[in-house]
Amino acid sequence: MGTSAIKYFDLKQFRTTGYRFDFKKMLDDKGNTAVYLFYSYVRICSIYRKLNLSQSDIDELVKTKKIEIKEKAEKNLVNHLLLFNDVIDEVLKDLALNLLCDYVYGIATKFSEFYEACKIQGNDSRILITELCKRFMKLSFDLLSLTPIEKI
């Protein structure tokens, strides 16, 4: 996690701006840090373990169920997830990986709001939204060359 924390702290800065190297800020578990992002990712993995859901169970839900958005937190999260292609276009146009960092941080914060506001257990639609978050976070981590963890 340490290497990813340093790498993320560097990538979240706009490429032409300087910053002060600060381990304390890099390893903070609050705010726009790799530790916070990994905590959100671990939370998703933990939800699946708690609900006894295997990846094949989730894949079956993806094939057979639909997402129904009823709550504001669900809408905010899904709308943010849908920005992915636009964010990637901007990253490529401006050579600004910090925009992808902001995007994945947005997923983490909006997922936290969703988790607090919406009961996931027993709701296939919310499990699917959770899976979307996991997949977009994993894809973002891969693009940023960060190695996520599934347990803390």
Predicted segment positions?
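Non-catalytic interaction-recognition regions
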Residues: 2-152
